[in-house]
């Protein structure tokens, strides 16, 4: 164990994870928004129209958190071209307008949500509720974990309570991602 080697915990991040095979049900609020989404005529598409989603994402992050995505539009497009089976874009459309979506990173047992965003109208219409119901209960049912990603900032010192509340509403439960620091000079060879 790391603690026996005097490893030091440097950060603890909280992620929200669903186990599609037998995860927790959506909250009452999420089910209500899902019902609304089903009656609003929204549709989901998986494509490579990253520019349509990126404008929603950038505006959302700027307005709500005064931040930009970790990746630029050019970077995510390039990554998608290099890894088309591992990086996928899902958009929620109202007619032809992008009102929500997410970028997924796919690996052996995990479907990880890297970016999530919706417009104000998309939020009102339940766009993300429709999207995550589809992703968790139809598209990624064979994955062991559906990971919504972390809900903390500053190395785990600040919990974004609104964000974790939303993720728990979709059935996500907390999983800790710990980072340790180990000085290799102090480790014995035996």
Regions picked out by a protein language model, each given a short descriptive name:
Residues 1-42, 148-190:
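Terminal substrate-recognition subdomain of acyl/acetyltransferases
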């Amino acid at each position: 164990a790391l603690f026996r080697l005097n490893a030091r915990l440097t950060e603890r991040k909280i992620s929200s994870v669903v186990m599609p095979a037998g995860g927790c049900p959506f909250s009452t609020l999420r089910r209500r928004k899902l019902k609304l989404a089903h009656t609003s005529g929204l549709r989901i598409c998986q494509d490579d129209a990253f520019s349509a989603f990126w404008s929603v994402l950038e505006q959302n992050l700027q307005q709500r958190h005064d931040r930009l995505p970790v990746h630029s539009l050019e970077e995510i497009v390039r990554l998608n071209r290099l890894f088309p089976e591992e990086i996928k874009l899902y958009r929620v459309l109202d007619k032809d307008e992008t009102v929500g979506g997410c970028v997924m990173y796919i690996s052996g047992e995990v479907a990880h949500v890297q970016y999530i965003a919706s417009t104000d109208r998309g939020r009102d219409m339940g766009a993300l509720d429709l999207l995550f119901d589809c992703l968790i209960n139809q598209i990624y049912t064979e994955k062991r974990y559906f990971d919504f990603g972390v809900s903390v900032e500053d190395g785990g010192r600040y919990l974004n309570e609104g964000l974790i509340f939303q993720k728990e509403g979709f059935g996500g439960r907390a999983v800790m991602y710990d980072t340790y620091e180990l000085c290799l000079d102090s480790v014995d060879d035996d």
